[in-house]
């Protein structure tokens, strides 16, 4: 195991009874000069997405742009206090169904509670159905999707538009969710309901959002099923926003 980040390690060593900051600060310190590391976790216990290798490759390229080292693994034993302390953020990339045991779940809860970042991509919402804490972290669980890829209009919030593109036409698999998360998160982007085949979310269909959770930062996008989407500059900029925010490089998700 590599040397852990001094900042996160110090926070994890603190009493869990200590109050967490409502707006978590970047998990770094003057004494910590190491390159920030991010774990991309890709374990699946259900459907396995073809986009996983492309997702890893894209995140590595984006990480290189902002000085973040990306480490990809399907090994759930990374989820213990000491190992998680070495990461600035953890990405759940297309994880499906139950991918962590009870002890690993508890370690991840402590990690986020002490300022660690979480970034979920697409099927990350198809995970952890028996883990209520995770359901709150990801924001909403997957419900259904129309068959095949859909050509839809995605509308970004004014201050969250990547590359200044508020209105974006995209072809991808579009999820409906079991609940609308808007009341509990900051919505980054929504699907135009008139361009979606099922319309199962009604007139308000969030597809990407962020929020703070128990001291950490959580960011999720429902896009990313189609490997071809990762070549789109708008989608890459969208992912980069999430990577920068969850690693504490940006105060705006």
Regions found by a protein language model. Name each.
Residues 5-16:
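Bacterial N-terminal signal peptides
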Residues 17-29:
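Signal peptide processing junction and immediate N-terminal pro/mature segment
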Residues 29-32, 37-127:
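Helical hinge/lid and interdomain linker segments adjacent to catalytic or ligand-binding clefts
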Residues 31-36, 42, 50-53, 57, ...:
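Extracellular ligand-binding/catalytic regions of CAZymes and related secreted enzymes
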Residues 96-164:
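A glycine-rich, often tryptophan-bearing local segment used as a flexible ligand/cofactor-contacting loop or short
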Residues 134-141, 177-185, 234-249:
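Oxidoreductase and adenylate-handling cofactor-binding alpha/beta cores
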Residues 140, 144-215:
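Catalytic beta-strand/loop cores that center a nucleophilic Ser/Cys/Thr
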